[in-house]
Amino acid sequence: MRLVIARCRVDYVGRLTAHLPTARRLLLIKADGSVSIHADDRAYKPLNWMSPPCWLVEDTVEDAEALWVVTNKAGEELRITIEEIEHDSSHELGVDPGLVKDGVEAHLQELLAEHVETLGSGYTLVRREYMTAIGPVDLLCRNADGASVAVEIKRRGDIDGVEQLTRYLELLNRDPLLAPVSGVFAAQQIKPQAKTLATDRGIRCLVLDYEALRGTESTEFRLF
């Protein structure tokens, strides 16, 4: 991983355009090729990014120290004009073991993958643990119309889980082979605040009955 702290301005050119004026920012270049731009006030969410597969070319320009052009397979560009570099270091982190879900969440994922029709009539499973640049999506499915659906599974659904699914959706919807991608937030319990946030973002909520999925007597699934 390469860490660069620099005064820079950023332009995203593609299906959408976005501009970040000059400011001090953290630039992350990961081993998978992804590039992300971070400020000091947004916890974990980058200001902008380019997901792999993408390619970074560093060039020189007259009015700045460097110009980074990051291009993805769709031809979209993330153009980072660097006015001054304050820090530049590279670090080998090795292979990360990844986040280990607790037993119930892992079993819920397995059961829901086996009974994907729980999500709705006509649903089919594309893949469990669909890998993205920011982590694996629990389930990637297709609905009855053939549209992509990302499913995040929790034992207890809270706002953090909705934020996590939101990040996945933002990333997946940049892939022209998958877009448009909708989301389902599935959990045994979903807190009211999480439900409100999910609904506001167009994410469907599904309350899971663990015992019913395991084949024992219980109540029906509730969709809302």
From Swiss-Prot:
InterPro entries recorded: Endonuclease_NucS, NucS_C, NucS_N, NucS_N_sf, tRNA_endonuc-like_dom_sf
Location of the protein in the cell: Cytoplasm
Entry GO CC: cytoplasm
Any one GO molecular function term: single-stranded DNA endodeoxyribonuclease activity
Keywords assigned: Cytoplasm, DNA-binding, Endonuclease, Hydrolase, Nuclease
Pfam families registered for this protein in UniProt: NucS_C (PF01939), NucS_N (PF21003)
Gene3D superfamilies: 2.70.180.20, 3.40.1350.10
EC code: 3.1.-.-
Family under the similarity heading: Belongs to the NucS endonuclease family.
Function: Cleaves both 3' and 5' ssDNA extremities of branched DNA structures.
Protein name as catalogued: Endonuclease NucS
